[in-house]
Amino acid sequence: MAKKTYDLLFKLLLIGDSGVGKTCVLFRFSDDAFNTTFISTIGIDFKIKTVELHGKKIKLQIWDTAGQERFHTITTSYYRGAMGIMLVYDITNAKSFENISKWLRNIDEHANEDVERMLLGNKCDMEDKRVVLKSKGEQIAREHAIRFFETSAKANINIEKAFLTLAEDILQKTPVKEPDRENVDISTTGGGTGLKKCCS
């Protein structure tokens, strides 16, 4: 049997209206790539990326969901096992922001109670086309006690920071396992809270 190359597996989910840039956000993080010609996600897709946090190798299994209503039944079935959910809206599309309340209700109905949530206002590089003020995103994040970032997959703004912060929040509430391994060094190497990227 092959030896595991990671210590922990975190399942993350990207949700939000169609066209807000979920797939672009995912590809920027997983492959450091940006493509303007992505077609709409059909149903659900996922990427894997391994990162290192506090000396632990964490495999992130990131699911990219379709935003269209006709895929609603398929995608909500993936909420249950998610440990972290990113809600994405487009700062140039007011409707996508208004629908965040609907997506939050979906999480309440279908996800685990202790799931970590994060709000992303994407396409922040398009300041000249902005219709959703940053303060609006901050307000809804405060109301629901969740983290908030404005991101740009195109300009690579806050993408890695958002994913690593979400992984960090999940790690903080993950119980330390493996009590049978006496040689485990639980001290954090290097101290501090340095978030280190590791190649997938």
Swiss-Prot record:
Regulated by guanine nucleotide exchange factors (GEFs) which promote the exchange of bound GDP for free GTP. Regulated by GTPase activating proteins (GAPs) which increase the GTP hydrolysis activity. Inhibited by GDP dissociation inhibitors (GDIs) which prevent Rab-GDP dissociation. It is an enzyme of class 3 (hydrolase). A motif (Switch 2) lies at residues 64-81. A motif (Switch 1) lies at residues 32-46. It is a lipid-anchor. Pfam families: Ras. Keywords: Cell projection, Cytoplasmic vesicle, Endoplasmic reticulum, Endosome, Golgi apparatus, GTP-binding, Hydrolase, Lipoprotein, Magnesium, Membrane, Metal-binding, Nucleotide-binding, Prenylation, Protein transport, Transport. Switch 1, switch 2 and the interswitch regions are characteristic of Rab GTPases and mediate the interactions with Rab downstream effectors. The switch regions undergo conformational changes upon nucleotide binding which drives interaction with specific sets of effector proteins, with most effectors only binding to GTP-bound Rab. Belongs to the small GTPase superfamily. Rab family. This is Ras-related protein Rab-10. It comes from Diplobatis ommata. The lineage of its organism: Eukaryota, Metazoa, Chordata, Craniata, Vertebrata.
